[in-house]
Amino acid sequence: MTDKIRSVQGKVVSDKMEKSFVVAIERKVKHPLYGKFIRRTTKLHVHDENNEAKVGDTVEIRECRPLSKTKSWTLVRVVEKAVIA
Protein backbone atom coordinates (compact mmCIF):
# COMPACT_ATOMS: atom_id res chain seq x y z
CA MET A 1 0.00 0.00 0.00
CA THR A 2 1.56 3.29 -1.09
CA ASP A 3 -0.37 6.08 0.61
CA LYS A 4 0.99 9.51 -0.18
CA ILE A 5 1.32 11.72 2.88
CA ARG A 6 -0.39 15.04 2.18
CA SER A 7 1.76 18.15 2.54
CA VAL A 8 0.48 21.73 2.17
CA GLN A 9 1.57 25.33 2.75
CA GLY A 10 -0.45 27.93 4.62
CA LYS A 11 -0.35 31.03 6.78
CA VAL A 12 -0.41 30.93 10.60
CA VAL A 13 -3.49 32.79 11.89
CA SER A 14 -3.27 31.91 15.61
CA ASP A 15 -0.49 30.73 17.92
CA LYS A 16 -2.19 31.18 21.30
CA MET A 17 -2.09 27.47 22.17
CA GLU A 18 0.88 25.70 23.74
CA LYS A 19 2.67 23.45 21.17
CA SER A 20 -0.08 24.13 18.61
CA PHE A 21 -1.19 26.73 16.11
CA VAL A 22 -3.89 27.29 13.50
CA VAL A 23 -3.09 27.51 9.77
CA ALA A 24 -5.36 28.97 7.07
CA ILE A 25 -5.11 27.17 3.73
CA GLU A 26 -6.56 29.10 0.79
CA ARG A 27 -7.78 27.36 -2.35
CA LYS A 28 -9.77 28.39 -5.40
CA VAL A 29 -12.98 26.53 -6.24
CA LYS A 30 -15.04 26.94 -9.39
CA HIS A 31 -18.68 27.90 -8.77
CA PRO A 32 -20.85 25.02 -10.04
CA LEU A 33 -23.37 27.22 -11.90
CA TYR A 34 -21.62 30.47 -12.81
CA GLY A 35 -18.08 29.19 -13.34
CA LYS A 36 -16.41 31.99 -11.37
CA PHE A 37 -13.45 30.97 -9.21
CA ILE A 38 -14.11 31.64 -5.52
CA ARG A 39 -11.53 31.70 -2.73
CA ARG A 40 -12.25 29.19 0.03
CA THR A 41 -10.32 28.99 3.31
CA THR A 42 -9.77 25.90 5.44
CA LYS A 43 -8.41 26.19 8.99
CA LEU A 44 -6.27 23.34 10.33
CA HIS A 45 -4.90 22.77 13.83
CA VAL A 46 -1.20 21.89 13.68
CA HIS A 47 1.21 20.38 16.22
CA ASP A 48 4.37 22.45 16.86
CA GLU A 49 6.63 20.71 19.40
CA ASN A 50 9.13 23.60 19.74
CA ASN A 51 6.74 26.56 19.36
CA GLU A 52 8.64 27.75 16.26
CA ALA A 53 5.80 29.31 14.24
CA LYS A 54 4.34 32.74 14.96
CA VAL A 55 1.31 34.59 13.55
CA GLY A 56 1.85 35.65 9.94
CA ASP A 57 4.50 33.01 9.14
CA THR A 58 4.15 30.87 6.03
CA VAL A 59 4.62 27.22 7.01
CA GLU A 60 4.74 23.78 5.43
CA ILE A 61 2.72 21.11 7.23
CA ARG A 62 2.04 17.42 6.67
CA GLU A 63 -0.66 15.01 7.73
CA CYS A 64 0.03 12.58 10.58
CA ARG A 65 -1.86 10.29 12.92
CA PRO A 66 -4.52 12.00 15.07
CA LEU A 67 -2.81 13.73 18.01
CA SER A 68 -6.03 15.01 19.57
CA LYS A 69 -9.69 15.56 18.67
CA THR A 70 -8.83 18.35 16.21
CA LYS A 71 -5.07 17.95 15.52
CA SER A 72 -3.87 15.59 12.80
CA TRP A 73 -1.22 17.78 11.12
CA THR A 74 2.38 18.51 12.16
CA LEU A 75 4.86 21.25 11.28
CA VAL A 76 7.55 20.38 8.71
CA ARG A 77 9.28 23.77 8.43
CA VAL A 78 8.76 27.51 8.53
CA VAL A 79 9.00 28.62 4.88
CA GLU A 80 8.95 32.38 5.49
CA LYS A 81 8.98 34.40 8.72
CA ALA A 82 6.46 37.23 9.13
CA VAL A 83 7.77 40.78 8.75
CA ILE A 84 7.34 42.61 12.06
CA ALA A 85 6.24 46.17 11.31
UniProtKB/Swiss-Prot annotation:
It holds the Pfam family Ribosomal_S17. Part of the 30S ribosomal subunit. GO terms for biological process: translation. CDD domains: Ribosomal_uS17. GO terms for molecular function: rRNA binding; structural constituent of ribosome. The keyword rRNA-binding applies. This is Small ribosomal subunit protein uS17. It comes from Haemophilus influenzae (strain ATCC 51907 / DSM 11121 / KW20 / Rd). Belongs to the universal ribosomal protein uS17 family. GO terms for cellular component: cytosolic small ribosomal subunit. NCBIfam families: PRK05610.1, uS17_bact. The lineage of its organism: Bacteria, Pseudomonadati, Pseudomonadota, Gammaproteobacteria, Pasteurellales. One of the primary rRNA binding proteins, it binds specifically to the 5'-end of 16S ribosomal RNA. Keywords: Ribonucleoprotein, Ribosomal protein, RNA-binding, rRNA-binding.
